[in-house]
Amino acid sequence: MPTQEMRALWHPTRARILELLKSRPAARSYLVEAAGAPYAEVAYHCRALCRSGCIQYVEGSGPDSADPRYEVV
């Protein structure tokens, strides 16, 4: 596993987000509720996971969407 991916996974919230996305793509609002973390924290960690290449935006969604959807790469 590349070092950048390993760094992306060290945080418990990031690990939880990845766990939730393994079964299906999900919207950020769902991840906030399911992870039990504040919206800003989930948004921050989703951006970090996108930059590391662990997750990506679902087609038709993106950073400017009101409620972006993500999937595991």
Regions found by a protein language model. Give the residues of each.
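Alpha-helical residues within the helix-turn-helix
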Residues: E33, C50-R51
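Short beta-strand "wing" residues that participate in macromolecule-binding interfaces
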Residues: Y57, V72
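Key DNA-contact positions within bacterial/archaeal DNA-binding proteins
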Residues: A40
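Glycine-centered, phosphate/nucleic-acid-interacting loop/turn motifs that mediate DNA/RNA or nucleotide
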Residues: G53, E59
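Short capping segments at the starts of secondary-structure elements
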Residues: P12, S23-A27
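Short alpha-helical segments that sit at the start of domains
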Residues: M1-R16
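Short acidic, hydrophobic short linear motifs in intrinsically disordered regions
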Residues: A26-A34
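Short, hydrophobic-biased segments on the C-terminal half of alpha helices
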Residues: C46-R47
